[in-house]
Curated annotation (Swiss-Prot):
Family, per entry: Belongs to the SMC family. MukB subfamily.
Residues the record lists as binding ATP: 34-41
GO molecular function terms listed in the Swiss-Prot or TrEMBL record: ATP binding; DNA binding
Source lineage: Bacteria, Pseudomonadati, Pseudomonadota, Gammaproteobacteria, Enterobacterales
Keywords, ordered alphabetically: ATP-binding, Cell cycle, Cell division, Chromosome partition, Coiled coil, Cytoplasm, DNA condensation, DNA-binding, Nucleotide-binding
Record's compositionally biased regions (Basic and acidic residues): 1051-1065
Species: Salmonella dublin (strain CT_02021853)
Top-level lineage group: Bacteria
Keyword hit for S-adenosyl-L-methionine: no
Keyword Transmembrane recorded: no
Name by which UniProt lists this protein: Chromosome partition protein MukB
The gene coding this protein: mukB
Residues covered by region (Disordered): 1049-1074
BP term (GO), one: DNA replication
Length: 1484
């Protein structure tokens, strides 16, 4: 028999009035007696505080501050403590004889709220000899001791071997230890459980019928059917979870589309941008490299252009200089040609003028002769006319004078004066100052003789003049010719000069005859000289172009070498063309192949992605299509095997589910029909009677009853005999046992127990041997154990089934994936890697481009060499025929020599041309020059002088004649003499005047006619002279101009000058064309250089910008790559097939995905913000952050109970696999989990019946309890009418309400609540939810109404109420109920802890004086029968004959208050180990 645990003692340390007091507790009743304020309530408060250290519950109302409502106010504990560390400890010993000390350390907290700090602790393994006060106090001297702190207590206990000290931070842990060690009767899991326990202690402490306990008797007495309730809750939770999971599946199915859409669009959005940046980075790198290559190429090209520019500029300078000289030469040649042409024209004019002059000269000579003759005749006529005129004038004068003298006397003076004038004139003319009128006559004769002599001399001279004039004209003509040829010279030198001129003329004519041959020779030599100069120029240019000076002898060898080089270069160029064509053809083929591979690469990459996914899914590596098809066959075989194994596991799981369902039947009935038969027969299933059998006893009772363990126990078999007739709806074997279901035992069989077996003697001649089953299922504990093992097996099977189903689904998905792969990608998946081929071909293309560039460079050099060789050969072809010219070093000297000879010949020709006619004229008359006819001039002078002398003589004679004639006038003596003497003279004068006038008229006519003729002759002569002089002057001018021109105007000069001009013009044109070409080339070169310079600057800028962009992008890209790798999304984003799309296509793809994403994340603020931030094109890492955020968001939305991965992409794949399987499995589970309303009603009814039976058994123990007029106490349990109606409807009319129970939107609890509301519309449910109401309706305790009844006096059974009972009756009744509650708790907790522990039972009763002696005795009897300890507080001693009584007296000693305690043990026999402490404790 298991001994019940007991409280041994209560120790108070440093409490008010108790410094170190230990109260030994009696095994039954401990009485605390004393007056008011003695410390009874303090002692009980210390006990309750150690038992329930919860300040939220502790409330000692007899000392609590009146009217206080604040939770922070003192609840009566603060005033019971003294300052410092306080302890309250309970010393217990449990059923296992283990000493356990539990207690609390209390300490007042400073402040006006009067709070108390409580620390619970426990001590195990303490020796029995150690008293609790020794643990927590330290003796200082005989009268002083010190209280240890909790830390000191722990250190002290740590030093004691085998002693364990535990300090608790949680009251739940403290109570859990006390429950496990059997100190308290119930496991206090929560504050609600602690509150119930405290209310029970409080009710027992203050006595009476507690309204709180009465109202909640169901919670105290009716055990919570945790198994059934947990089963309902688990079922509902499973159903709820199942439905939530199904809903989650449906959500997940929608999420799958969302996942697909979001992942697809996010992947397109980010991967397109990622690959675009990757492509752009590669493009930028390629562009940077291309820029750098182009930069270097441009620099080289610019340097080449600069060198070329320098060469062309130098050549252009040379051509400009040459052009200046050529222009000067050409202009000189043109001018020379013009001069030659002018000279020729001048020469023609000169010749023409010379011919004209010769003709004019002849005419002039003839006209001179005519004019001279006419002049002579004119002179004669003038003289004759003058003489006649003079004579007429004289005669008229004389006649006038005479007439005047005759007419007027005064004329005499006039005549005298005239005579004087005539004398004076005669003196003057005759140079005779002494002339007198008288000598005038003499002198007249003299002078007339002189006149006659002069006339004769003049006539002789005229004759001489006519003779000498011919010789003189020839000499003058010859002299003029010599003078014209030689220039002015002395007349005496004319002969010698003329002879020299004639000899020189012969030489000059000989030289002049050589002009044309010399000119032709000179022209030929000049042509050769020009060709030599041209050859030298060509040689210089050739050497300059060849960059080397060559000798003339080397040119032929060089020509042959160049010819050979041209042949080899021509072959090289032709072969290079073929090679270039072959390279370009290969390059085009490579480009075409690369294009084809680039088109095939995305398809191949898609196939590789699919193949890699297949390889990852199946863990195999495939190298050929045959392996894929073989693995597909293996996959089909594996799928068949997995399906077979899954079906087997499913069948076993269904069997386990059926067994679990069978074992889960209420009452242990494996057949539902047994419950119906038991209810029909009014019996109870045997399994239900033995439902509480322990797990250890289950094999025994299972073997004991054998097949009849499913029997129905009925009160009377005879009453059901009639009901057995016609019974068909029952098991094949139905066992019926007669007996009282309330007090049934196993005495119906005679049993012999063997080792692990029993022998049941059914009759004298029938025994049954039954071994203990290895897996008993008799009794709830055995069934629960079996169900637990079955659940474990079911979990394993479910997991295995889920795994197999997953594998089957996965295999099927894999099979479908393989089928799709075979249909779509098998033809290309195992082809060679196009990207590797592209890389190889790109390498080859780069080699070809490099080879082409090298070939082009070589070919260009060869072409340049070929062109140079051709130019060299062309130049040599022009040079080689002129080698003899180049070798002729005397050509220039010969040209100079011929030029000099030609100059001499031309000079001679000009001399002959100029003076040839004069020499021809001179040659026949040159002999006249031998003698100079100098007398001709003298004759002319003599003739003129004689003519003048004749004229003078004639004038003198006339003057003298006039004087002589006027001699009379000198002596007028009288006028008569003068008149008479002059009348004859007058007549003579008149006659003479007439003759003279006639002579004068004749002379005038002759003079006039000769004058007109002479004038005509003179005019002709003048015109001839003028024409001659003009032409002579023009000829002289032309000759001077011709001399000024300084050119030789021969017949070939113009042709040579024109040819020279044309040659120079051709050279100038060639030079200009070359210069223009060079200028254009130079301009083009400068433009090219400028373009190259601009291009170079742009390239440098672009290169630096691109390089900076590449470097900047590299840093950003490194961050992007780091973020990609850190988050493991590189495989998702680096989609190689996108590398073959253009930037516009990728940007379009990203923009489309962005538009879709904006709609997809419109309801998600976080993703929307991240997406908005990711739209910044300058921050590509934000797109990665968005992608990671999407993945994180999707990871958070992955149902881990459905999908076992964190990768949303894999989650989609698993969704596809899991969803259909989970949907099917969960649907079937829901069908299996779904319980019928009839089953629920039966379970609740059976539970109610069982608890009613248990309450009846508890009532049997209360039947003998009596207090005062109360003869008996009982509990009455009834089913509420509303709930009974609910059970009836659930059992019999559930079909009418299937709309509630078949709804997938309602749980069973909610459907039950809806049904309850439907059945009881008058009841107000308040704010409670249907789920809460349904859970309450699933608790059978809510179906019961429980009340306490007492049998009091003559009133019979009455409801126990405080107003109907006396105080003592109420206290006794309440104590009885509390004892029943404690017993009920123990029965309920027996299954929760070891069977070898019987917990302590202890109750309190304060103010027990209100009970009479009979009631006290009843309490003592109740405590003894129930092995319960009781602590009573009363002012007086109560039953000192039993139990232990402590007398408490509060005293003041030396201003120190303490409680004096005296213990008295009762008269009853003492239990061993009980001691009474008589020495009071004093507070130090």
């Amino acid at each position: 028999m298991i001994e019940r645990g007991k409280f041994r003692s209560l120790t108070l340390i440093n409490w008010n009035g108790f410094f170190a007091r230990t109260f030994d507790l009696d095994e039954l009743v401990t009485t605390l007696s004393g007056g008011n304020g003695a410390g009874k309530s303090t002692t009980m408060a210390a006990f309750v505080t150690a038992l329930i250290p919860d300040l939220t519950l502790l409330h000692f109302r007899n000392t609590t501050e009146a009217g206080a409502t604040s939770g922070s106010r003192d609840k009566g504990l603060h005033g019971k403590l003294k300052a410092g560390v306080c302890y309250s400890m309970l010393d217990t010993i449990n059923s296992r004889h283990q000493r356990v000390v539990v207690g609390v350390r209390l300490q007042q907290v400073a402040g006006r709220d009067r709070k108390v700090d409580i620390k619970p602790f426990a001590i195990q393994g303490l020796p029995m000899s150690v008293q609790p006060t020794q643990l927590v106090t330290e003796t200082l001297n005989e009268r002083q001791a010190r209280v240890l702190s909790l830390a000191e207590l722990k250190d002290k206990l740590d030093e004691m071997e085998g002693v364990q000290f535990k300090q608790f931070n949680s009251i739940t842990d403290y109570h859990s230890l006390m429950f496990d060690l059997g100190i308290i009767a119930r496991r206090l899991r929560s504050a609600s459980d602690r509150s119930k326990f405290y209310r029970l202690i409080e009710a027992s402490l203050y006595g009476g019928i507690s309204s709180a306990i009465t109202r909640s008797l169901r919670d105290y007495l009716l055990p919570e059917n945790s198994g059934v309730r947990k089963a309902f809750q688990d079922m509902e939770a499973a159903l709820r979870e199942n439905r939530l999971t199904l809903e989650a599946i449906r959500v997940t199915q929608s999420d799958r589309d969302l996942f697909k859409h979001l992942i697809s669009e996010a992947t397109d959005y980010v991967a397109a941008d990622y690959m675009r940046h990757t492509n752009e980075r590669r493009v930028h790198l390629d562009q940077a490299l291309a820029f750098r290559r182009e930069l270097y190429t441009s620099r080289k090209q610019l340097a080449a252009e600069q060198y070329k520019h320098v060469d062309m500029a130098r050549e252009l300078g040379e051509h400009n200089g040459a052009e200046g000289s050529l222009e000067a030469d050409y202009q000189a040649a043109s001018d020379h040609l013009n001069l030659v042409q002018t000279a020729l024209r001048q020469q023609e004019k000169i010749e023409r003028y010379e011919a004209d002059l010769e003709e004019l000269q002849i005419r002039l000579e003839e006209q001179n002769e005519v004019v001279a003759e006419a002049a002579e005749m004119q002179d004669e006529n003038e003289a004759r006319a003058e003489a006649a005129e003079l004579e007429v004038d004289e005669l008229k004068s004389q006649l006038a004078d005479y007439q005047q003298a005759l007419d007027v006397q005064q004329t005499r003076a006039i005549q005298y004066n005239q005579a004087i004038s005539a004398l004076a004139r005669a003196k003057e003319l005759c140079h005779l100052p002494d002339l007198t009128p008288e000598s005038a006559a003499e002198w007249l004769d003299t002078f007339q003789a002189k006149e006659q002599e002069a006339t004769e001399k003049l006539l002789s001279l005229e004759q001489k003049m006519s003779v000498a004039q011919t010789a003189h004209s020839q000499f003058e003509q010859a002299y003029q010719l010599v003078a014209a040829i030689n220039g002015p010279l002395a007349r005496s030198e004319a002969w010698d000069v003329a002879r020299e001129l004639l000899r020189d003329g012969v030489n000059q004519r000989h030289l002049a005859e050589q002009v044309q041959p010399l000119r032709m020779r000179l022209s030929e030599l000049e042509q050769r000289l020009r060709e030599q100069q041209e050859a030298e120029r060509l040689l210089a240019e050739f050497c300059k172009r060849q960059g080397k000076n060559f000798d003339i002898d080397e040119l032929e060898a060089l020509h042959q070498e160049l010819e050979a080089r041209i042949a080899s270069l021509s072959e090289s160029v032709s072969s290079a063309s073929e090679q270039r064509m072959a390279l370009r053809q290969e390059q085009e083929q490579l480009q075409s192949r690369i294009q084809h591979l680039m088109q095939r690469a995305p398809v191949w990459l898609a196939a590789q992605n699919s193949l890699n996914q297949l390889s990852e899914q199946c863990g195999e590596e495939f190298t050929s299509s045959q392996e894929v098809t073989e693995y597909l066959q293996q996959l089909l075989e594996r799928e068949r095997e997995a399906i077979v194994e899954r079906d087997e596991v499913g069948a076993r799981k269904n069997a386990v589910d059926e067994e679990i369902e069978r074992l889960s039947q209420p009452g242990g009935a494996e057949d539902q029909r047994l419950n119906a038969l038991a209810e029909r027969f009014g019996g109870v299933l045997l399994s239900e009677i033995y439902d509480d059998v322990s797990l250890e006893d289950a094999p025994y009772f299972s073997a004991l009853y054998g097949p009849s363990r499913h029997a129905i126990v009925v009160p009377d078999l005879s009453q059901i005999a009639e009901q057995l007739e016609g019974l068909t709806d029952c098991p094949e074997d139905l066992y019926l046992i007669e007996g009282d279901p309330q007090s049934f035992d196993d005495s119906v069989f005679s049993v012999d127990e063997l080792e692990k077996a029993v022998v049941v003697k059914i009759a004298d001649r029938q025994w049954r041997y039954s071994r203990f089953p290895s897996l008993p299922i008799f009794g709830r504990a055995a069934r629960e154990n079996r169900i637990e093992s079955l659940h474990a097996e079911r979990e394993v099977l479910s997991e295995r089934f889920a795994t197999l189903s997953f594998d089957v689904q996965k295999t099927q998905r894999l099979h479908q994936a393989f089928s799709r792969f075979i249909g779509s990608h098998l033809s290309v998946a195992f082809e060679d890697d196009p990207e590797a081929e592209i890389r190889r071909l790109n390498g080859r293309r780069v080699e070809l481009e490099r080879a082409l560039a090298t070939h082009e460079s070589d070919n260009q050099q060869q072409r340049l060499q070929f062109e140079q060789a051709k130019e060299g050969v062309s130049a040599l072809n022009r040079l080689l025929p002129r080698l003899n010219l180049l070798a002729d070093e005397t050509l220039a000297d010969r040209v100079d020599e011929i030029q000099e000879r030609l100059d001499e010949a031309q000079e001679a020709a000009r001399f002959v041309q100029q003076y040839g006619n004069q020499l021809a004229k001179l040659e026949p008359v040159v002999s006249v020059l031998q003698s100079d006819p100098e007398q001709f001039e003298q004759l002319k002078e003599d003739y003129a002088w004689s003519q003048q002398m004749q004229r003078d003589a004639r004038q003198q004679a006339f003057a003298l004649a006039e004087v002589v004639e006027r001699r009379a006038h000198f002596s007028y003596s009288d006028s008569a003499e003068m008149l008479s003497g002059n009348s004859d003279l007058n007549e003579k004068l008149r006659q003479r005047l007439e003759q003279a006038e006639a002579e004068r008229t004749r002379a005038r006519e002759a003079l006039r006619s000769h004058a007109a003729q002479l004038s005509q002759y003179s005019q002709v002569l003048a015109s001839l002279k003028s024409s001659y002089d003009t032409k002579k002057e023009l000829l002289n001018d032309l000759q001077r101009e011709l001399q000024d021109i300084g050119v030789r105007a021969d017949s070939g000069a113009e042709e040579r000058a024109r040819q020279r001009r044309d040659e120079l013009h051709a050279q100038l044109s060639n030079n200009r064309s070359r210069r223009n070409q060079l200028e254009k080339a130079l301009t083009f070169c400068e433009a090219e250089m400028e373009n190259l310079t601009r291009k170079l600057r742009k390239l440098e800028r672009d290169y630096h910008e691109m390089r900076e962009q590449v470097v900047t992008a590299k840093a950003g890209w490194c961050a992007v790559m780091r973020m990609v790798k850190d988050n493991g999304v590189e495989r998702r984003l680096h989609r190689r097939e996108l590398a073959y799309l253009s930037a516009d296509e990728l940007r379009s793809m990203s923009d489309k995905a962005l538009g879709a994403l904006r709609l997809a994340v419109a309801d998600n603020e976080h993703l929307r913000d991240v997406l908005r931030l990711s739209e910044d094109p300058k921050r590509p890492e934000r797109k990665i952050q968005f992608f990671v955020a999407v993945y994180q968001h999707l990871r958070e939305r992955i149902r881990q109970d459905i999908i076992r991965t964190d990768d949303p992409v894999e989650a989609i794949e698993q969704m596809e696999i899991e969803l259909s399987r989970l949907t099917e499995e969960l649907t079937s589970r829901e069908q299996k989990l779904a319980i019928s309303s009839r089953s629920v009603a039966n379970i609740i009814r059976k539970t109610i019946q069982r608890e009613q039976n248990r309450i009846r058994m508890l009532n049997q123990g209360l039947q003998s309890v009596s207090f005062g007029q109360v003869n008996s106490v009982r509990l009455n349990v009834n089913v509420r009418e509303t709930h009974a109606t609910l059970l009836d409807v659930l059992s019999e009319q559930q079909e009418q309400h299937q709309d509630l129970f078949n709804s997938n939107r309602l749980t069973f609890s909610e459907a039950l609540a809806k049904l309850y509301q439907r059945l009881n519309p008058q009841i107000d449910m308040g704010q409670r939810t249907p789920q809460t109401i349904g859970e309450e309706l699933l608790d059978y305790r809510n179906y019961l109404e429980m009340e306490v009844e007492v049998n009091r006096g003559s009133d019979g059974w009455l409801r126990a109420e405080s107003g109907a009972l006396s105080t003592g009756e109420a206290i006794g009744t309440g104590m009885s109920i509390l004892v029943m509650v404690v017993q009920s708790w123990e029965d309920e907790a027996r299954r929760l802890r070891g069977k070898d522990i019987s917990p302590c039972r202890l109750l309190f009763l304060d103010e027990a004086a209100r009970l009479d002696a009979r009631s006290i005795a009843t309490l003592f009897e109740l405590c003894e029968r129930l092995q319960m300890q009781l602590i009573i507080a009363a002012p007086e001693n109560i039953s000192p004959e039993k139990g232990t009584t402590y007398k408490l007296v509060r005293k003041v000693f030396q201003n120190t208050e303490h409680v004096h305690v005296v213990g008295l043990r009762g008269f009853a026999p003492q239990l061993p180990g009980t001691q009474t402490e008589d020495t009071p404790s004093e507070a130090s």
